[in-house]
Amino acid sequence: YDLHFKMLNAKNFKVPQDRKRVFFIGFRKDLKIDFKFPEGFKEEIPLSKAIGDLTEKVLSAKNGKNANNGHCPIPNHEYMDGGYSSIFMSRNRVRSWDETSFTIQAGARHAPLHPQAPKMKFIEQNKREFVQGKEHLYRRLSVRECARIQTFPDDFIFHYDNISAGYKMIGNAVPVRLAYYLAKEIKDSLSGSFLFQDIESKQLEKTV
């Protein structure tokens, strides 16, 4: 196989999130594919555009961690409630409305905090606190907000009993838009090969 690899940041592919990942793309050597990774876009999408319309009708998970099962006015618009670890509180976890999100991780307890809250106050190295008097504004992003940031469409519904499973499914996914641009580049690279043309012609014959 001819192997191509490159680190890509999802924020360069119309994903409202800082998310750096290394992608490996392999092609059979006999295809002689000269693959080029997509270049991306200069414009970044801020949180205000991604989740600005989801500020209301959000629910806290039952008992802090269980799904509200059919009672969310907006599907999956529920967030994990509960304490924050010392590791979580070691740095700021809030991005402003005009910024892209932190990386959406697979763990519910590591979900970024909602941009309605002010950035966390620096106390000393590896220690931050919520701004006094504004504590009520700090909450984790909801499952739906994380899905939006991962660019899943709103009609893609996640099913789970424990809300941690919802965060895990979303956090482990490749952002939808980034996957699209990668897949498009792969398709365009393959379209010139005889193998791909032969497959397309056979598929076309089935429809005639």
Regions found by a protein language model. Name each.
Residues 1-12:
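Conserved S-adenosyl-L-methionine
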Residues 17, 21-208:
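S-adenosyl-L-methionine-dependent DNA methyltransferase catalytic core
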